[in-house]
Amino acid sequence: AKETLNGTLTVTLDKTSIEEVSEEYTCKLEFNAVERDALGENIPDPVSFTSDSWKTIQKAVQTGNTSKYNIGDTKKVNLGDLGTHTVRISNMSACTNGEASETACGFVVEFADIITTHQFNSTNTNVGGWKDSEMRTYVNGTIYKALPSELQNVIISTKVISSHGSTSSETNFETQDKLYLLNAQEVWNTNDYDTSVGTTK
């Protein structure tokens, strides 16, 4: 039998009597979700974030086998016409039930350099915030589609809480995104109107 990810293979034998002198056994294999996903694939154990494939990284994160990875570890990613860029591990701590947003918990990877430039909106407005912005459409469309398919396949949707700005009649926005931007506090260590600070940490 193939060794499962956690080293345990559950086998249940249902005994069925055919004749007095012969017996037939039905073998039933039971796998957990992680085992089913990787069954039949020979995914190597982790060596380093820089050299491991995205499938190896995904398996390591799913099984909690991340001792070879550290915050700040980097890896090159080819985005085709957008060039080759560097990503790095920015967080490895698990999300807890009390998190208002998932952008700063779990296994988070960020770009360490500037991919390209793009307007937040084509007109001089930020009404609707990140949720309704052309930037969000661009990042989760053009940028996401430029990623290697192996990387796309391991990115999960993330609950993102973003600011409503200086207006007083709105609440913070909530979206589900594959990719998202760093908030002002994370980039400049300060902010003027970012009402999401404290909810995205």
Annotate each PLM feature.
Residues 2-41:
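C-terminal, structured domain-capping segment
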Residues 42-201:
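Collagenous Gly-X-Y triple-helix signature in extracellular proteins
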